[in-house]
């Protein structure tokens, strides 16, 4: 088993390498990879149906949040 992920349709197969039968460490690595790839967030969003209007509103709010964060970081870099 490789350490990367392979794309299958829309989902990515997340794989971790178990070394020296250290399952706890492998689980920790798996959880970290899944967190990074947004699997838990996706599961939470898909738990209930989201109306298209709600989805648009959520995505717009996320875009605004991202833009504000980028602006804040840009100003911080420039020393304001």
UniProtKB/Swiss-Prot annotation:
GO terms for molecular function: structural constituent of ribosome. One of its GO terms (cellular component) is ribonucleoprotein complex. InterPro entries: Ribosomal_bS21, Ribosomal_bS21_CS, Ribosomal_bS21_sf. Pfam families: Ribosomal_S21. GO terms for biological process: translation. Keywords: Ribonucleoprotein, Ribosomal protein. NCBIfam families: S21p. Belongs to the bacterial ribosomal protein bS21 family. HAMAP family: Ribosomal_bS21. This is Small ribosomal subunit protein bS21.
